[in-house]
A protein has these predicted regions:
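Helix-to-loop junction immediately C-terminal to a conserved catalytic motif
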Residues: 48
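The feature captures the beta-strand-to-loop junction immediately N-terminal to the Walker
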Residues: 33-35
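Catalytic Walker B motif of ABC-type/P-loop ATPase nucleotide-binding domains
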Residues: 144-148
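C-terminal coupling/interaction segments
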Residues: 65, 231-271
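ABC transporter nucleotide-binding domain
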Residues: 160-176, 180-238
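Conserved ABC ATPase "signature" region
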Residues: 86, 90, 97-115
C-alpha cells in the first residue's frame, strides 16, 4: 500500500507499540486485527490524535476533520438521540443549515429517525453503535477512526454497521477500524495484523492468504499440536515449506489461517 495522505510512520508508544507504520488511502477501509494487548486500541487513539507517540511520525488532519468512535462509547447516555446530534454539531461548529442536512442524512442512513427522542441509554446495543457512528460522521470527516465498532452487537446490526462504514468509504473518507472479528477484516481493502505491539503481517486479505508459506491441512486429529488450531469440529495444521505434508486434505486457507501462521512464525523466531 503506497503512502497516502494519512497514517503513521515507525511510531512507538512505550510498552504498547513498537515501530508500527500504516498508510491510509481515501475510499479504502483498513482493518487492524490482533489479540488482546496487540496494540489495536493504542493505534486507533494515535490515529485519532488522542494519544501522543514517543517516536515516529503521525500524519493526520486537524481535530475537526477526524471522526473518532472509541470502543463502547462515542455518545452521551443521558441525552436523547436528537440532543446527542445537536451537541456534536455544536462541538464541530456546524451551521444550522448544514446541521439539518447532515442530521437528516445520518438519521436516514442509521435508521434512527424514529428514535430521536429516546435516551441513548435506552437504545439497544446495535442502535447505540449506530448512534456513535452517526456522531462520528456527522461533520463529514476526512479520517474516520473506529475502535471495535461492532463488538458485542447482534449479527444483523453488524451488517447494518458495515453498510454505514462502507458508505463513508464510498464518499472518499479514509477509514481505519480495529476489530477482533477476522471475518470482518476480510471485507476490508487492507489489513494490518499486530502482535505484542509489533507488525505481524500486512496487505490485502486475498494477498495474505495466497502468500502463506508452506501448507495448511485440514484434519480430524493434528500430527503436530504446536502447529495446529481448531476450526469448528476439525483442525487446521500448518506444515512449513520444505517439510513433507501428511496425507490429509489440503485446506483452502483464509485470513484467520494467515494470521495464525504468521503468529506461529513470529513465536518460533522469538525463541
Amino acid at each position: 500500500m503506497t503512502e497516502g495522505s494519512f497514517g503513521v510512520d515507525h511510531v512507538t508508544v512505550a510498552g504498547r507499540l513498537d515501530h508500527v507504520s500504516l498508510n491510509l488511502a481515501p475510499g479504502t477501509i483498513v482493518a487492524v486485527v490482533g489479540g488482546d494487548g496487540a496494540g489495536k486500541s493504542t493505534l486507533m487513539r494515535v490515529l485519532a490524535g488522542a494519544l501522543l507517540v514517543d517516536s515516529g511520525r503521525v500524519r493526520i488532519p486537524g481535530p475537526d476533520r477526524v471522526g473518532f468512535v472509541p470502543t463502547g462509547a462515542g455518545f452521551y447516555p443521558d441525552l436523547t438521540v436528537a440532543e446527542n446530534l445537536r451537541f456534536a454539531a455544536t462541538a464541530y461548529r456546524l451551521g444550522e443549515v448544514r446541521f439539518r442536512g447532515r442530521r437528516d442524512y445520518v438519521l436516514g442512513l442509521t435508521g434512527l429517525g424514529d428514535f430521536t427522542e429516546r435516551l441513548a441509554a435506552d437504545l439497544s446495543g446495535g442502535m447505540r453503535q449506530k448512534l456513535a457512528l452517526a456522531l462520528g460522521t456527522l461533520h463529514e470527516p476526512e479520517l474516520l477512526v473506529l475502535d471495535e465498532p461492532t463488538t458485542g452487537v447482534d449479527p444483523v446490526s453488524r451488517v447494518d454497521l458495515w453498510r454505514i462504514i462502507a458508505d463513508a468509504a464510498a464518499g472518499g473518507v479514509h477509514v481505519v477500524l480495529a476489530t477482533s472479528y477476522i471475518d470482518e477484516a476480510e471485507r476490508a481493502g487492507h489489513v494490518l495484523a499486530l502482535h505484542a505491539g509489533r507488525r505481524l503481517l500486512e496487505g490485502a486479505p486475498s494477498e495474505l492468504t495466497t502468500a502463506i508459506p508452506g501448507v495448511v491441512s485440514e484434519r480430524h486429529r493434528p500430527e503436530e499440536r504446536s502447529r495446529a488450531w481448531r476450526r469448528g469440529t476439525r483442525w487446521h495444521e500448518w506444515t512449513p515449506a520444505g517439510l513433507s505434508v501428511p496425507g490429509d486434505e489440503v485446506a483452502e486457507p483464509d485470513l484467520e489461517d494467515a494470521v495464525i501462521v504468521a503468529a506461529l512464525q513470529r513465536e518460533a523466531a522469538d525463541r
